Amino acid sequence: MQYLNIKEDCNAMAFCAKMRSFKKTEVKQVVPEPGVEVTFYLLDREPLRLGSGEYTAEELCIRAAQECSISPLCHNLFALYDESTKLWYAPNRIITVDDKTSLRLHYRMRFYFTNWHGTNDNEQSVWRHSPKKQKNGYEKKRVPEATPLLDASSLEYLFAQGQYDLIKCLAPIRDPKTEQDGHDIENECLGMAVLAISHYAMMKKMQLPELPKDISYKRYIPETLNKSIRQRNLLTRMRINNVFKDFLKEFNNKTICDSSVHDLKVKYLATLETSTLTKHYGAEIFETSMLLISSENELSRCHSNDSGNVLYEVMVTGNLGIQWRQKPNVVPVEKEKNKLKRKKLEYNKHKKDDERNKLREEWNNFSYFPEITHIVIKESVVSINKQDNKNMELKLSSREEALSFVSLVDGYFRLTADAHHYLCTDVAPPLIVHNIQNGCHGPICTEYAINKLRQEGSEEGMYVLRWSCTDFDNILMTVTCFEKSEVLGGQKQFKNFQIEVQKGRYSLHGSMDHFPSLRDLMNHLKKQILRTDNISFVLKRCCQPKPREISNLLVATKKAQEWQPVYSMSQLSFDRILKKDIIQGEHLGRGTRTHIYSGTLLDYKDEEGIAEEKKIKVILKVLDPSHRDISLAFFEAASMMRQVSHKHIVYLYGVCVRDVENIMVEEFVEGGPLDLFMHRKSDALTTPWKFKVAKQLASALSYLEDKDLVHGNVCTKNLLLAREGIDSDIGPFIKLSDPGIPVSVLTRQECIERIPWIAPECVEDSKNLSVAADKWSFGTTLWEICYNGEIPLKDKTLIEKERFYESRCRPVTPSCKELADLMTRCMNYDPNQRPFFRAIMRDINKLEEQNPDIVSEKQPTTEVDPTHFEKRFLKRIRDLGEGHFGKVELCRYDPEGDNTGEQVAVKSLKPESGGNHIADLKKEIEILRNLYHENIVKYKGICMEDGGNGIKLIMEFLPSGSLKEYLPKNKNKINLKQQLKYAIQICKGMDYLGSRQYVHRDLAARNVLVESEHQVKIGDFGLTKAIETDKEYYTVKDDRDSPVFWYAPECLIQCKFYIASDVWSFGVTLHELLTYCDSDFSPMALFLKMIGPTHGQMTVTRLVKTLKEGKRLPCPPNCPDEVYQLMRKCWEFQPSNRTTFQNLIEGFEALLK
């Protein structure tokens, strides 16, 4: 922008030299008064003066923002700056004010994005994300409807700050290359004065160029230029002044008439950015004598200087991120005549120097902010870690400068990548920490809050907490609720409630109740019924911030949009490998529904017309042909692996379909599974070694989280060791293998087997798989790493594992408190409360600095036993049943004492029962604790009493009772189809029991319990016995209370019980089921009609005789003949001739088709 052509006696080069020297020296400071004051660039604002006490820098920034009417949305662009030390204060910096304190700080916009105004057509525009634009991505054209980066107050403040910087020579005026270039820079500065004065005149409604004498252009140009002009002769000064006035008038006539005050502010600030006046405006440049750029375990000491001289520069900008270069030499500018002479004499030398310096002036990109995972500060050394495991390490002049540098990068990260995360605990903003702990968002707008509720299901009572966009003292709670209308029925609405924050106390607007924390307030509100207008509701689930969530808190720059490509999982994507190109090797083991083989992949390369066969060692994961029904899920896992590329994730070559086999072909990793290695080398493992493994795994999972991909099967046996690293400084190198069969297709039993690696929510619903599940698995895997690959809960049965989750237990954590806390946070039963993987990586690095001893940790000998019930917490409700020797009660197990505990069925012996009965109950307990099937009643635990002499059996309570009670009451809504479904479920439970070599001996409708209208479970295992492995039957030593009318002939005659004997009993139970347990058609009533009146042992004798004669229970009313024929197959006299439970299942399923 060249407005004037002033050459006469204008020593432009002197001015430029002064500008450079001025920037190197301290800005002339006014000695601050005692105390602390925060000054503003707005002339009508008095400094903020602080009384005695402690303040955080963030707290002072909020107070300053309120003074200057800066909105909460723009507040995070500002920070506190100390001109005397040239350092910025991190948000968590504690400022102590006492009698001896004397400090002046400047409230400044620190975080700057060039072309935020969009007037530079050569550069991409910058704006805030808005709900309208979030689906469209980044567009090259300007988007007028997008949300501007700055509000009016922020723009006004930035304009005042820009003027201050130019006048005080704080703006980075570019270095001139020639004498003429120096004149051009002077002209640009004078042009800025034209804009500033025009703005002032328009604000004051003055006419240009008639201005008061005290309004001189000298007040609006750099002080060094003003000083330079004053040293020039009078004629030159007058000429400058006259030409300036003429131009001001011309500018007013041609430009001002079409401009507003806003336009002039934008024009002024946009000109400050231009390369004709400044260089790197809005950037911060840090000088260092040590700069290391390295990849993981491969150090590249590319930049270091033992002498301590400053050689390198690191620049941080909002638009381009972190860049570095070797500091270029300052080339003095010579006058044109001298330069021409020197060019002739030393042309070649200059040419080489210029080329070398040009290379030095070019900046090298290191990282844009979303790529950064965490930052570590050690004294004055800063280590920046990227997602691709590259690292930048630089040494700054002091720890204070290191904190200033890190707080800059951290702030830009929140503006461009994740508004609710911090990269380094040393600079963590207290408000961000508070928000994370309370599940509260920053000042997102209402549209984003409602969008979030809709995305998460919009259930009634679901809510979002967010700070107000306009008021620093208010938090808004946006809630999903339903308005009840007689005409429209339930109509979904979103209501906002205001939470007031005053002096650290929180209260709902309109309420007199105040609470010391937001968490306390929300816990209180969740217990209340909230009302507004004609709507009432109860708060349920809080929708917490998620990693990398798009909102109006984030700034959309071209770099941020380009950083992460969008992956679509809507279509399967992987490389197809021909079966002729793989050679199968030895069998290595089994996975879940898969077989693992070593193998060779033949890769054909055609180089320069010569075909070359390359053999690659691979692993072949073959889906069992009997499970071809889950081929699609198998391919989905392969597709997920093909979409990722990370050094700590196993590489998938592709998929091969070979006849009926589906095969995943993946990278062979030499060291094999980590758990086996840790078992073998447990004595050689060190704390640093374990931390490296944990960090590498967290890095891989953070990468997946950024892409919103879920692994679903994280554990040490799925971590493969590419390098042992025990005897070297480089350390281990691990790779995360593929997840195998997705959790979504696992049976419930397979899910239970994966406890405690599988997340609790996935056990309840295997399709409820999210990134949060990997965080739980990481916590368990961290436990394994700590304890050298030991298996948690390895001695627990399936039923005990299930109870472990039902009781919300976790494995016993290590003695290191911080490590235990990290595991606990990962293994939170609320998926929304688990930390982001970026936060996990940050915390692991912080923890590693403390160097805790996790080598000597031995596996805990005592784990929490969720199957142990304390007698004092069992509250009796009522009796459920009673026999000769025992009884069953309904109790509530209520350790919290608030009547919210679960209801359980408690089986115990009567006081008069003898020792044999106690032994029988203990056998029943031992059987139940080893059984796990969806159609067998769940064992929950035991309760010891009388010093261990007494025992109670705790089982799940099924309120609908047994089939004998349920069927007569619900006869109208249970048809034949449902009866057959019940029959199939009973057969499945009995088939499972037989597969474990148990005979039930008491199968009857009274012992089949109803969980729901669609599911039944087999119960009462009091007579159940185990068959010895070398026999096919169990011999009863006594026959007390034997259910003779359900017994097979061999049981009545020889007291021998086979699995086939249970098949006979099932036939009788099926008869009960089909007669709806009508007492007139009960087995006892029907058999007594056949054998006549009798009692005692004669009943058994006559019953046996009747059965030998071939008489059986008649066909139930309305029972199809096909069903009765299946029933009759259960009643073959010889056990070996009877049908099996598996055949019965197939028969019933065929009838249902």
UniProtKB/Swiss-Prot annotation:
Keywords: Acetylation, ATP-binding, Kinase, Magnesium, Membrane, Metal-binding, Nucleotide-binding, Phosphoprotein, Repeat, SH2 domain, Transferase, Tyrosine-protein kinase, Ubl conjugation
Domain Protein kinase: 582-854, 874-1152
Residue numbers of Phosphoserine PTMs: S228
Co-factor: note: Mn(2+) was used in the in vitro kinase assay but Mg(2+) is likely to be the in vivo cofactor.
Cofactor field: Mg(2+)
Taxonomy, superkingdom: Eukaryota
Modified residues (Phosphotyrosine): Y3, Y1033, Y1034
Ranges that cross the membrane: none
Any Pfam family hit: FERM_F1
Post-translational modification N-acetylmethionine, affected residues: M1
Entry's localization field: Endomembrane system
Residue span(s) of domain FERM: 34-420
One of the GO biological process terms: cell surface receptor signaling pathway via JAK-STAT
Binding site for ATP: L880, G881, E882, G883, H884, F885, G886, K887, V888, K907
InterPro entries: Band_41_domain (IPR019749), FERM_2 (IPR035963), FERM_central (IPR019748), FERM_domain (IPR000299), FERM_F1 (IPR041155), FERM_F2 (IPR041046), JAK (IPR051286), JAK1-3/TYK2_PHL_dom (IPR041381)
Function: Tyrosine kinase of the non-receptor type, involved in the IFN-alpha/beta/gamma signal pathway. Kinase partner for the interleukin (IL)-2 receptor as well as interleukin (IL)-10 receptor. Kinase partner for the type I interferon receptor IFNAR2. In response to interferon-binding to IFNAR1-IFNAR2 heterodimer, phosphorylates and activates its binding partner IFNAR2, creating docking sites for STAT proteins. Directly phosphorylates STAT proteins but also activates STAT signaling through the transactivation of other JAK kinases associated with signaling receptors.
Family the UniProt entry places it in: Belongs to the protein kinase superfamily. Tyr protein kinase family. JAK subfamily.
Protein name per its UniProtKB record: Tyrosine-protein kinase JAK1
Organism field: Mus musculus (Mouse)
Gene that this polypeptide is encoded by: Jak1
